[in-house]
């Protein structure tokens, strides 16, 4: 079944679920009907720390409490180069707007790192380095990135000192990401 969507298209969640015949929620959405796995990297509202390093996205696996395992959709993504499941990537820069990046390929070099879960506890997560199949990421306008950073800064201002300290501790070992933008 051919999915009709173009790189850079911005759609809503209802359109995404109709197009891919997948769940309406979650960052990893498996569809047996279309033999796809839809990944949503939500930069607006998410506990996960997905990061771009040039043309490679290090995507955080599924599981919001406790250590993540290589089960369910994490296993599907981990085995995606062998199991025939086509993996599609969307990014969210503004609420309810899903920007289609394209088909991605797992580079086979997954690793684990510490991140905070939804209860604020440190845990091990799986990180999956992904590359766009065509090698060309959709360039994101730098004003979109700046707006996103401002939104995150506003949410940080609402935290108390203890919450900020805990957040800083959890990010201490995390590499800084960078991405290609357009001015």
Model-derived regions: residue spans:
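Acidic, glycine-rich low-complexity segments with interspersed aromatic residues
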Residues: 2-99
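Residue-level signal for secondary-structure boundary sites
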Residues: 47, 112, 136-138
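Short coil/turn segments at secondary-structure boundaries
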Residues: 52, 102, 117-118, 142-144
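Beta-strand-rich binding-surface signature
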Residues: 84-86, 101-103, 125-129
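Structured beta-strand/turn binding interfaces of compact recognition modules in eukaryotic regulators
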Residues: 92, 107, 133
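Short beta-strand and beta-hairpin "edge-sheet" elements
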Residues: 99-113
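Short proline/glycine-enriched turn/loop segments at secondary-structure junctions
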Residues: 113-121
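ATP-dependent helicase/translocase motor core
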Residues: 120-183
């Amino acid at each position: 079944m051919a999915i009709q969507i173009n790189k850079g298209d911005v759609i809503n969640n209802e359109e995404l679920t109709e197009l891919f015949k997948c769940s309406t929620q979650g960052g990893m959405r498996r569809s047996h009907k279309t033999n796809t796995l839809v990944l949503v990297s939500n930069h607006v509202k998410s506990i996960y720390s997905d990061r771009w390093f040039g043309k490679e996205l290090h995507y955080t696996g599924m599981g919001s409490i406790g250590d993540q395992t290589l089960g369910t959709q994490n296993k599907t993504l981990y085995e995606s180069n062998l199991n025939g499941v086509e993996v599609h990537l969307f990014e969210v820069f503004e609420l309810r707007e899903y920007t289609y990046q394209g088909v991605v390929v797992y580079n086979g070099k997954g690793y684990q790192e510490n991140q905070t879960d939804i209860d604020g506890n440190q845990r091990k997560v799986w990180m999956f380095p992904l590359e766009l199949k065509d090698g060309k990421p959709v360039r994101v306008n730098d004003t979109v990135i700046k707006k996103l950073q401002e939104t995150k800064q506003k949410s940080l201002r609402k935290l108390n000192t203890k919450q900020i300290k805990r957040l800083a501790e959890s990010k201490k070992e995390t590499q800084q990401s960078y991405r290609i933008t357009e001015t």
